[in-house]
Amino acid sequence: MAPPTQRRYTNNRKRRGPREVGGAKTGDGLTRIMKRIRDLERVLKRPVPMDEQKRIELERAVAAYKVQAEDIIGDRKNKKNVEKYRMIRFFERQKASRKVKQARKLVEQADSDAKKKDAEALVVKYMADLAYTIHFPNDIKYISLYPNGAVDETAESSKQREKMRAEFAEQIKNGELDVDLERAEQVATTKKSKKKREAGADEEVKGDDEDDEFLEKAPKKAKVEEEESDDDEEDEEDDDDDDDSDDDDSDDSGEPQMEIKRTADEKQTKEEESDSEEFVDESEAESEGKPESEENSEDQDDESE
């Protein structure tokens, strides 16, 4: 039995990422960056004399790779938190928007300065809540603005929530933060209408596909019909040719038939003439034979007497 063929592994695949020591590209993955950091740190820890300029370049490369790794980790964490707390922030944004509208109505309906002042304070408070739901940092865990009882509430989370509320309220009072209520409502309604738009887009794409399919089939169908019409025309031409040939055959065969008929008529006339001649001969013979019989009968009578 022949020995199994040994598989050869080669390093012919394309390298991904930078091959140089210095500088870190943005497109590198986190695993490759961390591996590069470990390799460079291992080189720096070797008890081998190294040029000072090269050591500085390696240290700068390590620092650049670490910054890039931190950015990638932060982006991944932000995306994770956005996806995780997306629904709760959406509902709390809607609730804060309703409260802002109610507070603004109170300001318009206030019949005294004291009530108007209290209503304006409520507007600022609820605007801060709306800013809280919009501008809450994504790199930390989202703390619910309206906690569900004592289950979600802790002393630390309550303290952090009130701190961020106060910061947003201060920024709104100083004009440093502008919260657009219409934009917040648009963001809230966008998610509701997203499915409708996607459904409409699917129907439009389906209609376009049907139109494309019809346009693709139409030339083929027209071509098939054209071929069928050509075949029908060819069949009609063949039938006409057959009819013409039949007429020619009938014309060609008509002359012999007429000759046969003419000979038959001539033969019949000859037979009729011969029959008439025989009849005449017989009649003459009868007329000649009658007097003789009468004479014979008279002679017999005389003898008997």
Swiss-Prot record:
Q: Where is the composition biased (Acidic residues)?
A: 205-214, 225-254, 272-286, 294-305
Q: Which UniProt keywords apply?
A: Coiled coil, Nucleus, rRNA processing
Q: Which portions of this protein are annotated as coiled-coil regions?
A: 51-121
Please name one Pfam family that this protein belongs to: Efg1
InterPro entries referenced in this protein's UniProt entry, alphabetically: Efg1, EFG1_rRNA-proc
Q: Report any one BP term from Gene Ontology.
A: maturation of SSU-rRNA from tricistronic rRNA transcript (SSU-rRNA, 5.8S rRNA, LSU-rRNA)
**What function is annotated for this protein?**
Involved in rRNA processing.
Q: Which family does it belong to?
A: Belongs to the EFG1 family.
Q: What is this protein called?
A: rRNA-processing protein EFG1
| Species whose genome carries this gene | Yarrowia lipolytica (strain CLIB 122 / E 150)
